[in-house]
Amino acid sequence: EGTLTFYSDGKYASSLETHLSTDVPANWVKYQVPCVRLRDYLTEPVDFLKMNIEGAEWQVLADSEEQLRRIREMVIEYHHLPGLPRTLHQILTLLHRQGFEYLINDFDSETNGGVSSPFRLTSQSRFYLLIYARRLD
């Protein structure tokens, strides 16, 4: 709860992540936005949750871990971007711990020009994954 800094290019790209705070592209605008915790909204069963939060997936999932058992299925867009911590393993471990089975699909460079081939992984590589998770109990 409180406010976070949100960066946007005014079109499609945006981020809440602090890796931009020292290297913000000139055409991006910085906003202070109010924020709330997802966990505060997970008080009743949820059929489906879609999460596309531009690199903040791990922080939100970790903060909401105990409430995730109320979700039947979800899709998480995972962002692997230069300057962000690599949190895929933590996310998948958390999902497993909370009783989810999951499938992972990647965005390819043919459908998303901002994506690097996973076969050319470097410290500057960027790729996006869709994690489909479902409780089987």
What are these regions (language model features)?
Residues 1-137:
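Phosphate/nucleotide-binding beta-alpha loop and adjacent structural elements of enzyme active sites
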